[in-house]
A protein has these predicted regions:
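C-terminal binding/interaction regions
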Residues: 12-16, 20-21, 100-166
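Glycine-rich phosphate/diphosphate-binding loop of Rossmann-like nucleotide-binding domains
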Residues: 15-34
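A short beta-strand-loop structural module common to alpha/beta enzyme folds
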Residues: 38-49
């Protein structure tokens, strides 16, 4: 992918939420789409359609693992439950963020492919700034890459030999 002012052009981003967080997911979907990202919605699609956060988190994480999308944005009430589900998919790193600094760090230091947040925790404008910070940040190498390798080794130690995902 080409780099364009610290972001990847043609990046494909998957979005997922439970039924309680559709509003914020939709706002973030349109926000990043307006910036030129290719956006894919994995649901929930209606507040009347009950979708549990583990289902949404898993869908987006598995799509990254398969290579169907590059990164993900997940939203539930707090961001915690949906990120826990995504993190169960081997090779996936999802970080919960409720501020811009953390959003930058989970990308630079932890090489997270997914950012998660809570509709009950962050407002719309802050959420936009959070995703902007995440997608404008770049993964750092050196000691940070070594630490991510240590996390991958934990997965391997527990039988996930195919855990590495870049």
């Amino acid at each position: 992918m080409e780099k364009d002012s610290c972001r990847e052009v043609n990046m494909k981003i998957g979005f997922g939420s439970d039924h309680a967080a559709i509003e914020l997911k939709s706002v973030l979907f349109e926000h990043l789409k307006s910036k030129g990202y290719e956006c894919v919605d994995f649901g929930a699609y209606s507040p009347d359609q009950k979708v549990d956060y583990p289902i949404a988190g898993r869908k987006v994480a598995e799509a990254i693992r398969r290579g169907d999308i590059d990164k993900g944005v997940l939203v539930c009430g707090t961001g915690v439950g949906i990120s826990l589900a995504a993190n169960k998919v081997p090779g996936i790193r999802a970080g919960v963020c409720s501020d811009c600094f953390t959003a930058k760090m989970v990308k630079e230091h932890n090489h997270c492919q997914i950012i998660a947040m809570g509709q009950r925790v962050v407002g719309t404008e802050l959420a936009k700034m959070i995703v902007d910070n995440f997608f404008e940040a770049e993964e750092l190498g050196g000691r940070h890459a070594n630490r991510v390798d240590m996390i991958t080794q934990i997965e391997r130690d527990y039988g996930y030999a195919d855990a590495p995902i870049k």
